[in-house]
Structure formats: C-alpha cells, structure tokens
C-alpha cells in the first residue's frame, strides 16, 4: 500500500471487501506499507491480518475532511456574478458561489462526524482495538511506522 487515501465511500467499500475476503477464503490478508499508508488507504489496510511497515512509513491519518470553498469574493473581484436557481435554499451550498450559512455548516459538520465515526469503528474492528483507543488516535495526523506499531495500528 502506498497511498495518501481517497474517498470515504471507496475506503469503506474496500475495507468491507478485504475483511470479507479473509472471512470467505480463510486466507490471511497481508499489507505491505510503502512510504504512505494514510486515511482511506489505512482504513482498507486496517482490515488485514498483518500490516508490515518500515520504521519511517507515514501511517494513519484517521480523520475525515469535507471541503467547501467560498469563491464569491474572488468572483466579485473578477466581475463575475452567478445566479443560482435552485429548488431549495441549500441546494447550491457546496458550489462555492456564496458562504455557507451557520445551519449549512452545522449540517456538513454532522455529516463529517458521522463518516468519521464509521471510519473509527472500521479501524477498531479491523485492528481488534477498543473504539475509544482508536478515537484517541484519530487526530487526522500520521504516525511513523514505529509509533503506529506501538499504538496497535
């Protein structure tokens, strides 16, 4: 594995596949970590029976991010105006043509929290660790291979 991650959905689906493969076949799944094994890539790897790593590999980055860019100020400076015609007030909230409202930001934060909880649960199950231990490691940062091993990742 040599990846900084990917999408939450792909990570979840591939983690399920890796876990299911081992259960269906009775064969162990072995992951060899290269330079980086992070985020969704680590979520997938966490389902393996064995994870091999170099001492200096970047492992972990357990966390979730959703980016909504507000380009409205830049568009205004460039003389670009956008009229969004929508079926609901929040339909254009992720288009970047206006700032998020407080309610929209709270909505997206709730989604991130739900997705992150799934990530944490998946890692806890795959590494046979208590959920609270994984949650404590879910800082979004990577660990060196040495520290990841010490932490049970």
Residue ranges, per PLM feature:
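Small-residue-centered hinge/linker elements
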Residues: 1-27, 33-126
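Secondary-structure end/capping motifs
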Residues: 119-153
């Amino acid at each position: 594995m040599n990846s900084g991650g990917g999408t939450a959905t792909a990570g979840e689906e591939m983690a399920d596949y890796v876990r299911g493969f081992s259960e269906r076949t009775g064969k162990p799944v072995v992951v060899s970590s290269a330079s980086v094994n992070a985020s969704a890539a680590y979520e997938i790897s966490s389902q393996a029976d064995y994870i091999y790593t170099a001492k200096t590999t970047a492992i972990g980055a357990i966390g979730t991010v959703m980016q909504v860019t507000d380009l409205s100020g830049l568009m205004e400076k460039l003389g670009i105006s956008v009229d969004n015609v929508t079926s609901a007030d929040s339909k254009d909230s992720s288009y970047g043509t206006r700032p998020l409202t407080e309610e929209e930001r709270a909505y997206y934060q709730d989604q991130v929290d739900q997705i992150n909880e799934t990530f944490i649960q998946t890692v806890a199950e795959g590494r046979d660790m208590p959920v609270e231990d994984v949650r404590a490691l879910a800082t979004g940062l990577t660990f060196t291979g040495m520290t990841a091993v010490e932490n049970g990742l």
